[in-house]
Amino acid sequence: MTYGTRYPTLAFHTGGIGESDDGMPPQPFETFCYDSALLQAKIENFNIVPYTSVLPKELFGNIVPVDQCVKSFKHGAVLEVIMAGRGAATVDGTHAIATGVGICWGQDKNGELIGGWAAEYVEFFPTWINDEIAESHAKMWLKKSLQHELDLRSIVKHSEFQYFHNYINIKKKYGFSLTALGFLNFENADPVTIK
């Protein structure tokens, strides 16, 4: 049987942070801190595969908080994600990390939903921050990026932008912050036939 390309129909948003005084070179924050961030995000038992940032229209209205679907997670499964995640070491002058994912939806000239796009945001801070700073910076930069996605394609905004963010004030040697969309259910487009 021939299948067309696969696209997600259900997604969830999540986020997590991690920090540690231990790690392995060359990027010590990529080991223990990243694992802790995945655990807090409740996606630690998936094999993570990153996506770029195009969303099918079937996801509109079908992006839920992670807690609504975590009981259905399958240990060892592949989880395709759009993720903004980075780590840092305080010795390099970073004392806080903010991350975020934003979503925009576009419409055609008749006002019909076409689909959407996501944007990722990561920012390093030399001092500790609070949630208000993390949220305002995430929205500022994601709004700019999402509008660029629409303008690049000459597409009109269909609905309000959506934003998800996270941050960490690093109290140990290393820290990691992530914000992600994970994709769970899928359908297939019609197969392509060449005549």
UniProtKB/Swiss-Prot annotation:
Residues flagged as site, Cleavage (non-hydrolytic): 52-53
InterPro entries tied to this protein: Pyr-dep_his/arg-deCO2ase (IPR016104), Pyr-dep_his/arg-deCO2ase_sand (IPR016105), Pyruvoyl-dep_arg_deCO2ase (IPR002724)
Gene Ontology MF: a single term: arginine decarboxylase activity
Enzyme type, top EC level: lyase
Compartments (UniProt record): Cytoplasm
GO cellular component: cytoplasm
Entry cofactors: pyruvate
Modified residue annotations for Pyruvic acid (Ser): 53
Keywords, ordered alphabetically: Cytoplasm, Decarboxylase, Lyase, Pyruvate, Virulence
Catalytic activity from the UniProt record: L-arginine + H(+) = agmatine + CO2
The keyword Lipoprotein is annotated on this UniProt entry: no
Textual note on the cofactor: Binds 1 pyruvoyl group covalently per subunit.
Chief location of this protein within or outside the cell: cytoplasm
Gene3D superfamilies according to UniProt: Pyruvoyl-Dependent Histidine Decarboxylase, subunit B
One GO term (biological process): arginine catabolic process
Domain of life: Bacteria
Catalytic activity, EC: 4.1.1.19
Family to which the UniProt record says this protein belongs: Belongs to the pyruvoyl-dependent arginine decarboxylase family.
Subunit structure: Trimer of an alpha-beta dimer.
Function: Part of the AaxABC system, catalyzes the decarboxylation of L-arginine. The arginine uptake by the bacterium in the macrophage may be a virulence factor against the host innate immune response.
Designated name of the protein: Pyruvoyl-dependent arginine decarboxylase AaxB
